Amino acid sequence: MIFPAIDLRAGQSVRLYQGDFKQATLINPDPVVQAQQINAAGLQQLHMVDLDGAKSGRPENFATITAIRQAFTGTIELGGGIRTYELATRYLELGIDRLILGSVALTDPRLVKRLLSEFGGERIVIGLDGTNGYVAIKGWLEQSQTKMSTLMKTMTTSGAKHFIVTDVARDGTMQGPNLALYQELQAQVPTANLIASGGVRNLTDVQVLQASGFKDVIIGKALAEGGVTLAELAGVTEC
């Protein structure tokens, strides 16, 4: 599946460079319109992140997320600051299809295990973000001492099936995806489904990832800068 990305900051769609909040580029002042454009192109998946929430641990763009959920007819996965059971269930009740749990997978694994047990591995997805193989947390503002592979194995034991893997150093850079990282993690946990995120430049990158076995790909900056079009991505999903 192809997941166009919308990252929310102060109610607008932006892109960060290597997760740096000081290096934000405005993509669309009205992310609802952006979501509708994705739908209109024939794409039925949307990856969304509350960047402000990722920093604060609170729902900072709830009204915008609600409006996008009402406007977008397909599947929405959402991450960013989901660190309590109450917020997780609030988003699920809103109609969000899949929740992405990042920092909390490291800081509160019992909560993640509870959510996985209650809602299942199809609705609870683990966001595995890292630098040099180590997990980054709290909106990528902190780097932990835990290896990405270690956390992945722990979460698999807890019932996780899907992992969105992002090399922070590649995110928003248009330098190409870190295929070697995906292959290394996949080799360590063969049963997991890895969703590639970060660095995708064009349609060729998508095709290389899929040919390598990584069928699910998230695309953000390449869409904003014209490296790939929604129409091209819609064609990929039809193959």
Swiss-Prot record:
<keyword id="KW-0028">Amino-acid biosynthesis</keyword>
<dbReference type="Pfam" id="PF00977">
    <property type="entry name" value="His_biosynth"/>
</dbReference>
<comment type="similarity">
    <text>Belongs to the HisA/HisF family.</text>
</comment>
<dbReference type="GO" id="GO:0000105">
    <property type="term" value="P:L-histidine biosynthetic process"/>
</dbReference>
<dbReference type="InterPro" id="IPR011060">
    <property type="entry name" value="RibuloseP-bd_barrel"/>
</dbReference>
<protein>
    <recommendedName>
        <fullName>1-(5-phosphoribosyl)-5-[(5-phosphoribosylamino)methylideneamino] imidazole-4-carboxamide isomerase</fullName>
        <ecNumber>5.3.1.16</ecNumber>
    </recommendedName>
</protein>
<dbReference type="GO" id="GO:0003949">
    <property type="term" value="F:1-(5-phosphoribosyl)-5-[(5-phosphoribosylamino)methylideneamino]imidazole-4-carboxamide isomerase activity"/>
</dbReference>
<keyword id="KW-0413">Isomerase</keyword>
<dbReference type="GO" id="GO:0005737">
    <property type="term" value="C:cytoplasm"/>
</dbReference>
<dbReference type="InterPro" id="IPR006063">
    <property type="entry name" value="HisA_bact_arch"/>
</dbReference>
<comment type="pathway">
    <text>Amino-acid biosynthesis; L-histidine biosynthesis; L-histidine from 5-phospho-alpha-D-ribose 1-diphosphate: step 4/9.</text>
</comment>
<feature type="active site" description="Proton donor">
    <location>
        <position position="129"/>
    </location>
</feature>
<keyword id="KW-0368">Histidine biosynthesis</keyword>
<dbReference type="InterPro" id="IPR044524">
    <property type="entry name" value="Isoase_HisA-like"/>
</dbReference>
<feature type="active site" description="Proton acceptor">
    <location>
        <position position="7"/>
    </location>
</feature>
<dbReference type="InterPro" id="IPR023016">
    <property type="entry name" value="Isoase_HisA-like_bact"/>
</dbReference>
<dbReference type="GO" id="GO:0000162">
    <property type="term" value="P:L-tryptophan biosynthetic process"/>
</dbReference>
<dbReference type="InterPro" id="IPR006062">
    <property type="entry name" value="His_biosynth"/>
</dbReference>
<dbReference type="InterPro" id="IPR013785">
    <property type="entry name" value="Aldolase_TIM"/>
</dbReference>
<keyword id="KW-0963">Cytoplasm</keyword>
